[in-house]
């Protein structure tokens, strides 16, 4: 999936560049991230692969892994508008866990994807 240009962004020391996302139904979970965040998804395998919207992170949706829920490390995805993103989350089978709250000049919130994973989204600047 990654091309030569994105490989130079992915294969760099000390950068987070690969995620394994638990997914009881990998096809449904992959469709969620594709619809909500515009990730590039490859569904032609039992554990669909993805590349995020920046080309810095790749990974797989893992069918036999259990979602951590609210425990464990929680990745946060940067978005332009948290409110619009949360609307998309709900429309595509996810749910809001915590409402958006300010942290300095940021707005931060968490959601649960269709597989039960809890992740966060955040935006910089005013929430309008």
What are these regions (language model features)?
Residues 1-28, 56-57, 73-75, 124-128:
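N-terminal beta-strand motif that seeds the catalytic metal site of vicinal oxygen chelate
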Residues 16-24, 66-91, 107-112:
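Vicinal oxygen chelate
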Residues 25-40:
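Amphipathic alpha-helical segments
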Residues 29-33, 89, 116:
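Conserved active-site tyrosine of GNAT-family acetyltransferases
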Residues 38-73, 118-124:
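Conserved short beta-strand elements that form part of the metal-binding/catalytic scaffold
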Residues 40, 93-97:
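A common structural junction motif
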Residues 45-47, 103-107:
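Short acidic/glycine-enriched loop/turn segments that link adjacent beta-strands
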């Amino acid at each position: 999936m990654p091309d030569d240009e994105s490989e130079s962004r992915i294969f760099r020391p000390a950068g987070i560049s690969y995620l394994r996302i638990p997914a009881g139904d990998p096809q449904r979970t992959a469709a969620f991230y594709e619809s909500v965040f515009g990730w590039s998804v490859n569904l032609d395998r039992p554990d669909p692969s993805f590349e995020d919207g920046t080309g810095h992170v790749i990974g797989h949706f893992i069918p036999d892994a259990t979602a951590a829920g609210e425990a464990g490390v929680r990745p946060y995805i940067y978005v332009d508008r948290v409110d619009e993103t949360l609307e998309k989350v709900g429309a595509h089978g996810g749910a809001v866990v915590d409402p958006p709250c300010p942290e300095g000049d940021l707005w931060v919130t968490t959601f649960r994807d269709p597989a039960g994973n809890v992740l966060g989204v955040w935006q910089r600047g005013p929430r309008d």
